[in-house]
Amino acid sequence: MSGQPKRLMVMAGGTGGHVFPGLAVAHHLMAQGWQVRWLGTADRMEADLVPKHGIDIDFIRISGLRGKGVKALLAAPLRIFNAWRQARAIMKRFKPDVVLGMGGYVSGPGGLAAWSLGIPVVLHEQNGIAGLTNQWLAKIATTVMQAFPGAFPNAEVVGNPVRTDVLALPLPQERLAGRDGPIRVLVVGGSQGARVLNQTLPQVAARLGDTVTIWHQSGKGAQHTVEQAYAGVGQSQHKVTEFIDDMAAAYAWADVVVCRSGALTVSEIAAAGLPAIFVPFQHKDRQQYWNALPLENAGAAKIFEQPQFTVEAVADTLAGWSREALLTMAERARAVSIPDATERVASEVSRVART
Protein backbone atom coordinates (compact mmCIF):
# COMPACT_ATOMS: atom_id res chain seq x y z
CA MET A 1 0.00 0.00 0.00
CA SER A 2 2.81 2.45 0.84
CA GLY A 3 3.89 2.55 -2.82
CA GLN A 4 0.52 3.91 -3.95
CA PRO A 5 0.29 7.64 -4.75
CA LYS A 6 -1.30 9.87 -2.13
CA ARG A 7 -4.78 11.18 -2.90
CA LEU A 8 -6.01 14.74 -2.41
CA MET A 9 -9.50 16.13 -2.83
CA VAL A 10 -9.57 19.91 -3.32
CA MET A 11 -12.80 21.61 -2.21
CA ALA A 12 -13.15 25.05 -3.81
CA GLY A 13 -15.66 26.88 -5.93
CA GLY A 14 -17.56 29.95 -6.94
CA THR A 15 -14.89 32.54 -7.70
CA GLY A 16 -11.38 32.73 -9.09
CA GLY A 17 -10.15 33.81 -5.66
CA HIS A 18 -10.96 30.31 -4.38
CA VAL A 19 -10.36 28.24 -7.52
CA PHE A 20 -7.01 29.57 -8.82
CA PRO A 21 -5.09 29.07 -5.54
CA GLY A 22 -6.54 25.55 -5.36
CA LEU A 23 -5.33 24.83 -8.89
CA ALA A 24 -1.83 26.07 -8.04
CA VAL A 25 -1.57 23.65 -5.10
CA ALA A 26 -3.15 20.80 -7.10
CA HIS A 27 -0.62 21.15 -9.94
CA HIS A 28 2.28 21.32 -7.46
CA LEU A 29 1.23 18.05 -5.81
CA MET A 30 0.36 16.34 -9.11
CA ALA A 31 3.94 17.05 -10.24
CA GLN A 32 5.02 15.06 -7.15
CA GLY A 33 2.87 12.09 -8.18
CA TRP A 34 -0.29 12.81 -6.19
CA GLN A 35 -3.74 11.83 -7.49
CA VAL A 36 -6.06 14.85 -7.26
CA ARG A 37 -9.82 15.18 -7.65
CA TRP A 38 -11.95 18.27 -7.14
CA LEU A 39 -15.22 18.82 -5.31
CA GLY A 40 -17.28 21.67 -6.75
CA THR A 41 -20.69 22.75 -8.01
CA ALA A 42 -21.94 22.30 -11.57
CA ASP A 43 -23.16 25.88 -12.06
CA ARG A 44 -20.04 27.87 -11.07
CA MET A 45 -16.72 28.59 -12.79
CA GLU A 46 -14.93 25.49 -11.47
CA ALA A 47 -17.19 23.25 -13.59
CA ASP A 48 -15.47 24.44 -16.79
CA LEU A 49 -12.11 25.57 -15.48
CA VAL A 50 -10.97 22.55 -13.45
CA PRO A 51 -11.34 19.92 -16.23
CA LYS A 52 -9.36 22.23 -18.57
CA HIS A 53 -6.50 21.80 -16.09
CA GLY A 54 -6.61 18.02 -16.44
CA ILE A 55 -8.31 17.42 -13.07
CA ASP A 56 -11.45 15.30 -12.62
CA ILE A 57 -14.27 17.05 -10.79
CA ASP A 58 -17.25 15.78 -8.80
CA PHE A 59 -20.30 17.93 -8.11
CA ILE A 60 -22.56 18.46 -5.12
CA ARG A 61 -25.65 20.70 -4.98
CA ILE A 62 -25.15 23.62 -2.60
CA SER A 63 -25.45 27.42 -2.67
CA GLY A 64 -24.96 30.32 -0.27
CA LEU A 65 -27.36 31.29 2.50
CA ARG A 66 -26.56 35.01 2.83
CA GLY A 67 -29.35 37.30 1.70
CA LYS A 68 -31.84 34.46 1.11
CA GLY A 69 -35.48 34.63 2.17
CA VAL A 70 -37.06 32.88 5.17
CA LYS A 71 -38.23 29.94 3.04
CA ALA A 72 -34.70 29.26 1.79
CA LEU A 73 -33.26 29.54 5.31
CA LEU A 74 -35.82 27.04 6.66
CA ALA A 75 -34.85 24.62 3.88
CA ALA A 76 -31.12 25.14 4.51
CA PRO A 77 -30.57 22.28 7.01
CA LEU A 78 -32.04 19.76 4.56
CA ARG A 79 -30.01 21.17 1.67
CA ILE A 80 -26.79 21.03 3.71
CA PHE A 81 -27.60 17.47 4.84
CA ASN A 82 -28.18 16.36 1.23
CA ALA A 83 -24.95 18.04 0.08
CA TRP A 84 -23.10 16.34 2.97
CA ARG A 85 -24.49 12.94 1.87
CA GLN A 86 -23.42 13.58 -1.73
CA ALA A 87 -19.91 14.64 -0.65
CA ARG A 88 -19.61 11.66 1.68
CA ALA A 89 -20.50 9.21 -1.12
CA ILE A 90 -17.94 10.86 -3.44
CA MET A 91 -15.20 10.63 -0.80
CA LYS A 92 -16.03 7.00 -0.01
CA ARG A 93 -15.38 6.22 -3.69
CA PHE A 94 -12.20 8.29 -4.08
CA LYS A 95 -10.77 7.60 -0.60
CA PRO A 96 -8.60 10.75 -0.28
CA ASP A 97 -5.76 10.77 2.26
CA VAL A 98 -6.53 14.43 2.96
CA VAL A 99 -8.94 17.14 1.78
CA LEU A 100 -7.99 20.77 1.17
CA GLY A 101 -10.69 23.41 1.66
CA MET A 102 -9.95 26.60 -0.28
CA GLY A 103 -13.29 28.31 0.31
CA GLY A 104 -16.64 28.66 -1.38
CA TYR A 105 -19.93 27.07 -0.32
CA VAL A 106 -18.78 23.59 -1.36
CA SER A 107 -16.15 23.50 1.39
CA GLY A 108 -18.78 23.35 4.16
CA PRO A 109 -20.54 20.05 3.40
CA GLY A 110 -17.29 18.71 1.89
CA GLY A 111 -15.26 19.40 5.02
CA LEU A 112 -17.99 17.97 7.25
CA ALA A 113 -18.17 14.83 5.09
CA ALA A 114 -14.40 14.33 5.28
CA TRP A 115 -14.40 14.84 9.06
CA SER A 116 -17.24 12.32 9.49
CA LEU A 117 -15.16 9.75 7.56
CA GLY A 118 -12.01 10.40 9.60
CA ILE A 119 -10.23 12.11 6.67
CA PRO A 120 -7.96 15.01 7.76
CA VAL A 121 -9.21 18.48 6.76
CA VAL A 122 -6.69 21.20 5.82
CA LEU A 123 -8.12 24.73 5.45
CA HIS A 124 -6.70 27.75 3.68
CA GLU A 125 -8.35 31.17 4.16
CA GLN A 126 -7.51 33.54 1.29
CA ASN A 127 -8.97 36.72 2.78
CA GLY A 128 -7.93 39.00 5.63
CA ILE A 129 -11.21 38.22 7.39
CA ALA A 130 -12.52 34.65 7.47
CA GLY A 131 -15.62 33.66 5.52
CA LEU A 132 -18.55 32.03 7.34
CA THR A 133 -17.81 28.56 5.97
CA ASN A 134 -14.19 28.61 7.10
CA GLN A 135 -15.07 30.08 10.53
CA TRP A 136 -17.28 27.06 11.05
CA LEU A 137 -14.94 24.47 9.49
CA ALA A 138 -11.93 25.70 11.49
CA LYS A 139 -13.47 24.03 14.56
CA ILE A 140 -13.07 20.55 13.00
CA ALA A 141 -10.02 21.10 10.77
CA THR A 142 -6.69 19.36 11.37
CA THR A 143 -4.78 22.45 10.20
CA VAL A 144 -5.82 26.03 9.38
CA MET A 145 -3.63 28.36 7.29
CA GLN A 146 -4.26 31.97 6.30
CA ALA A 147 -3.03 34.25 3.53
CA PHE A 148 -3.06 37.45 5.61
CA PRO A 149 -2.68 37.92 9.38
CA GLY A 150 -5.89 38.39 11.32
CA ALA A 151 -8.40 35.96 9.81
CA PHE A 152 -7.65 33.40 12.55
CA PRO A 153 -5.67 34.33 15.68
CA ASN A 154 -3.38 31.29 15.78
CA ALA A 155 -3.17 30.16 12.15
CA GLU A 156 0.12 30.22 10.25
CA VAL A 157 0.39 33.02 7.67
CA VAL A 158 1.40 31.35 4.39
CA GLY A 159 0.22 33.81 1.71
CA ASN A 160 -1.97 33.01 -1.28
CA PRO A 161 -0.80 30.57 -3.96
CA VAL A 162 -0.44 32.62 -7.17
CA ARG A 163 0.21 31.69 -10.78
CA THR A 164 3.74 30.70 -11.73
CA ASP A 165 3.87 33.21 -14.61
CA VAL A 166 3.37 36.06 -12.10
CA LEU A 167 6.05 34.65 -9.79
CA ALA A 168 8.43 34.41 -12.77
CA LEU A 169 8.34 38.18 -13.49
CA PRO A 170 11.65 40.04 -13.09
CA LEU A 171 12.07 41.83 -9.75
CA PRO A 172 10.92 45.50 -9.61
CA GLN A 173 14.40 47.05 -9.73
CA GLU A 174 15.20 44.96 -12.81
CA ARG A 175 11.84 45.62 -14.48
CA LEU A 176 11.35 49.31 -13.71
CA ALA A 177 14.90 50.69 -13.72
CA GLY A 178 15.53 52.98 -16.68
CA ARG A 179 11.86 53.48 -17.58
CA ASP A 180 10.85 56.98 -18.60
CA GLY A 181 7.95 58.68 -20.34
CA PRO A 182 4.33 58.64 -19.13
CA ILE A 183 3.47 56.62 -16.02
CA ARG A 184 1.85 53.34 -17.09
CA VAL A 185 -1.42 52.83 -15.21
CA LEU A 186 -3.11 49.41 -15.30
CA VAL A 187 -6.80 49.54 -14.35
CA VAL A 188 -8.35 46.20 -13.39
CA GLY A 189 -11.90 45.76 -12.14
CA GLY A 190 -11.85 41.97 -12.12
CA SER A 191 -13.45 39.86 -14.84
CA GLN A 192 -16.81 41.52 -14.09
CA GLY A 193 -15.29 44.99 -14.22
CA ALA A 194 -16.06 47.66 -11.62
CA ARG A 195 -18.40 50.49 -12.50
CA VAL A 196 -16.67 53.00 -10.22
CA LEU A 197 -13.34 52.41 -12.00
CA ASN A 198 -14.97 52.59 -15.42
CA GLN A 199 -16.62 55.92 -14.58
CA THR A 200 -13.72 57.57 -12.73
CA LEU A 201 -10.56 56.71 -14.66
CA PRO A 202 -11.46 58.44 -17.95
CA GLN A 203 -11.93 61.66 -15.94
CA VAL A 204 -8.60 61.06 -14.18
CA ALA A 205 -6.97 60.63 -17.61
CA ALA A 206 -8.42 63.98 -18.71
CA ARG A 207 -6.83 65.69 -15.70
CA LEU A 208 -3.43 64.06 -16.08
CA GLY A 209 -3.16 64.34 -19.88
CA ASP A 210 0.01 62.97 -21.44
CA THR A 211 1.71 62.28 -18.08
CA VAL A 212 -0.01 58.87 -17.99
CA THR A 213 -0.80 56.06 -20.39
CA ILE A 214 -3.63 53.73 -19.34
CA TRP A 215 -4.48 50.09 -20.03
CA HIS A 216 -8.03 49.61 -18.76
CA GLN A 217 -9.78 46.27 -18.32
CA SER A 218 -13.45 47.21 -18.51
CA GLY A 219 -15.08 43.88 -17.70
CA LYS A 220 -17.64 41.98 -19.72
CA GLY A 221 -19.87 44.07 -21.97
CA ALA A 222 -18.42 47.45 -20.94
CA GLN A 223 -15.58 47.96 -23.43
CA HIS A 224 -17.48 50.19 -25.87
CA THR A 225 -18.93 52.39 -23.09
CA VAL A 226 -15.51 52.88 -21.48
CA GLU A 227 -13.85 53.62 -24.84
CA GLN A 228 -16.52 56.26 -25.45
CA ALA A 229 -15.89 57.74 -21.99
CA TYR A 230 -12.18 58.16 -22.77
CA ALA A 231 -12.93 59.56 -26.25
CA GLY A 232 -15.50 61.95 -24.78
CA VAL A 233 -12.79 63.70 -22.74
CA GLY A 234 -10.25 63.71 -25.60
CA GLN A 235 -8.31 60.70 -24.29
CA SER A 236 -8.97 58.06 -26.95
CA GLN A 237 -5.27 57.06 -27.08
CA HIS A 238 -5.66 54.84 -24.01
CA LYS A 239 -6.12 51.07 -24.40
CA VAL A 240 -9.41 49.50 -23.27
CA THR A 241 -9.93 45.73 -23.29
CA GLU A 242 -12.88 43.72 -22.01
CA PHE A 243 -10.67 41.11 -20.40
CA ILE A 244 -6.91 40.58 -20.03
CA ASP A 245 -5.94 36.96 -20.67
CA ASP A 246 -2.26 37.36 -19.79
CA MET A 247 -2.20 39.19 -16.45
CA ALA A 248 1.53 38.53 -16.01
CA ALA A 249 2.25 40.50 -19.20
CA ALA A 250 -0.03 43.32 -17.99
CA TYR A 251 1.76 43.45 -14.62
CA ALA A 252 5.13 43.49 -16.41
CA TRP A 253 3.97 46.47 -18.50
CA ALA A 254 2.55 48.50 -15.58
CA ASP A 255 4.15 51.04 -13.27
CA VAL A 256 1.10 51.17 -10.97
CA VAL A 257 -2.24 49.34 -10.70
CA VAL A 258 -5.69 50.74 -9.85
CA CYS A 259 -8.00 47.92 -8.81
CA ARG A 260 -10.35 46.21 -6.38
CA SER A 261 -8.66 44.32 -3.55
CA GLY A 262 -9.83 40.75 -3.81
CA ALA A 263 -7.46 38.39 -2.01
CA LEU A 264 -5.86 36.93 -5.12
CA THR A 265 -5.43 40.34 -6.79
CA VAL A 266 -3.64 41.72 -3.72
CA SER A 267 -1.38 38.66 -3.52
CA GLU A 268 -0.55 38.81 -7.24
CA ILE A 269 0.28 42.52 -7.07
CA ALA A 270 2.59 41.91 -4.10
CA ALA A 271 4.26 38.95 -5.83
CA ALA A 272 4.74 40.99 -9.02
CA GLY A 273 6.09 43.91 -6.98
CA LEU A 274 3.76 46.75 -8.01
CA PRO A 275 2.46 49.90 -6.32
CA ALA A 276 -1.33 50.06 -6.19
CA ILE A 277 -4.37 52.18 -5.55
CA PHE A 278 -6.92 49.82 -4.01
CA VAL A 279 -10.68 50.48 -4.05
CA PRO A 280 -12.21 47.82 -1.77
CA PHE A 281 -15.59 46.44 -2.74
CA GLN A 282 -18.10 47.66 -0.14
CA HIS A 283 -18.95 44.39 1.57
CA LYS A 284 -20.46 44.47 5.06
CA ASP A 285 -17.48 42.67 6.67
CA ARG A 286 -14.98 44.92 4.78
CA GLN A 287 -13.14 41.83 3.55
CA GLN A 288 -11.34 43.62 0.71
CA TYR A 289 -10.23 46.47 2.97
CA TRP A 290 -8.50 44.02 5.30
CA ASN A 291 -6.88 42.29 2.31
CA ALA A 292 -5.32 45.57 1.13
CA LEU A 293 -4.28 46.92 4.53
CA PRO A 294 -0.93 45.04 4.85
CA LEU A 295 0.29 46.63 1.59
CA GLU A 296 -0.83 50.12 2.64
CA ASN A 297 0.87 49.63 6.02
CA ALA A 298 4.07 48.61 4.21
CA GLY A 299 4.04 51.85 2.18
CA ALA A 300 3.36 49.95 -1.04
CA ALA A 301 -0.23 51.04 -1.72
CA LYS A 302 -2.96 53.58 -1.05
CA ILE A 303 -6.49 52.53 -0.10
CA PHE A 304 -9.48 54.63 -1.17
CA GLU A 305 -12.82 53.50 0.22
CA GLN A 306 -15.37 53.95 -2.55
CA PRO A 307 -16.86 57.28 -1.30
CA GLN A 308 -13.32 58.76 -1.22
CA PHE A 309 -12.43 57.44 -4.68
CA THR A 310 -12.94 60.77 -6.48
CA VAL A 311 -11.40 62.07 -9.69
CA GLU A 312 -9.48 64.74 -7.76
CA ALA A 313 -8.13 62.35 -5.11
CA VAL A 314 -6.93 59.75 -7.62
CA ALA A 315 -5.44 62.29 -10.03
CA ASP A 316 -3.60 64.07 -7.20
CA THR A 317 -2.26 60.77 -5.85
CA LEU A 318 -0.96 59.57 -9.21
CA ALA A 319 0.53 63.00 -10.01
CA GLY A 320 2.33 62.99 -6.67
CA TRP A 321 4.21 59.72 -7.29
CA SER A 322 7.55 60.12 -9.06
CA ARG A 323 9.22 57.18 -10.78
CA GLU A 324 11.61 56.93 -7.80
CA ALA A 325 8.66 56.78 -5.39
CA LEU A 326 6.95 54.11 -7.51
CA LEU A 327 10.09 51.96 -7.55
CA THR A 328 10.38 52.20 -3.75
CA MET A 329 6.71 51.20 -3.40
CA ALA A 330 7.19 48.31 -5.84
CA GLU A 331 10.12 46.99 -3.81
CA ARG A 332 8.08 47.27 -0.59
CA ALA A 333 5.21 45.34 -2.21
CA ARG A 334 7.55 42.56 -3.26
CA ALA A 335 9.15 42.49 0.21
CA VAL A 336 5.84 41.70 1.94
CA SER A 337 4.81 39.05 -0.60
CA ILE A 338 5.11 35.34 0.19
CA PRO A 339 6.29 33.91 -3.15
CA ASP A 340 6.50 30.31 -1.89
CA ALA A 341 2.85 30.18 -0.71
CA THR A 342 2.03 27.26 -3.03
CA GLU A 343 4.90 25.21 -1.62
CA ARG A 344 3.92 26.07 1.95
CA VAL A 345 0.31 24.92 1.49
CA ALA A 346 1.37 21.79 -0.44
CA SER A 347 3.94 20.95 2.23
CA GLU A 348 1.32 21.14 4.98
CA VAL A 349 -1.06 18.93 2.95
CA SER A 350 1.77 16.37 2.55
CA ARG A 351 2.63 16.51 6.26
CA VAL A 352 -0.98 15.96 7.33
CA ALA A 353 -1.36 13.05 4.88
CA ARG A 354 1.70 11.33 6.39
CA THR A 355 0.58 11.58 10.02
UniProtKB/Swiss-Prot annotation:
Keywords: Cell cycle, Cell division, Cell inner membrane, Cell membrane, Cell shape, Cell wall biogenesis/degradation, Glycosyltransferase, Membrane, Peptidoglycan synthesis, Transferase. UDP-N-acetyl-alpha-D-glucosamine binds at T15, G16, G17, N127, R163, S191, I244, A263, L264, T265, V266, S267, E268, Q288. Cell wall formation. Catalyzes the transfer of a GlcNAc subunit on undecaprenyl-pyrophosphoryl-MurNAc-pentapeptide (lipid intermediate I) to form undecaprenyl-pyrophosphoryl-MurNAc-(pentapeptide)GlcNAc (lipid intermediate II). Pfam families: Glyco_tran_28_C (PF04101), Glyco_transf_28 (PF03033). It is a peripheral membrane protein. It catalyses: di-trans,octa-cis-undecaprenyl diphospho-N-acetyl-alpha-D-muramoyl-L-alanyl-D-glutamyl-meso-2,6-diaminopimeloyl-D-alanyl-D-alanine + UDP-N-acetyl-alpha-D-glucosamine = di-trans,octa-cis-undecaprenyl diphospho-[N-acetyl-alpha-D-glucosaminyl-(1->4)]-N-acetyl-alpha-D-muramoyl-L-alanyl-D-glutamyl-meso-2,6-diaminopimeloyl-D-alanyl-D-alanine + UDP + H(+). GO terms for molecular function: UDP-N-acetyl-D-glucosamine:N-acetylmuramoyl-L-alanyl-D-glutamyl-meso-2,6-diaminopimelyl-D-alanyl-D-alanine-diphosphoundecaprenol 4-beta-N-acetylglucosaminlytransferase activity; undecaprenyldiphospho-muramoylpentapeptide beta-N-acetylglucosaminyltransferase activity. It comes from the Bacteria. NCBIfam families: murG (TIGR01133). Belongs to the glycosyltransferase 28 family. MurG subfamily. This is UDP-N-acetylglucosamine--N-acetylmuramyl-(pentapeptide) pyrophosphoryl-undecaprenol N-acetylglucosamine transferase. It is found in: Cell inner membrane. GO terms for biological process: carbohydrate metabolic process; cell division; cell wall organization; lipid glycosylation; peptidoglycan biosynthetic process; regulation of cell shape. Pathway: Cell wall biogenesis; peptidoglycan biosynthesis. Its EC number is 2.4.1.227.
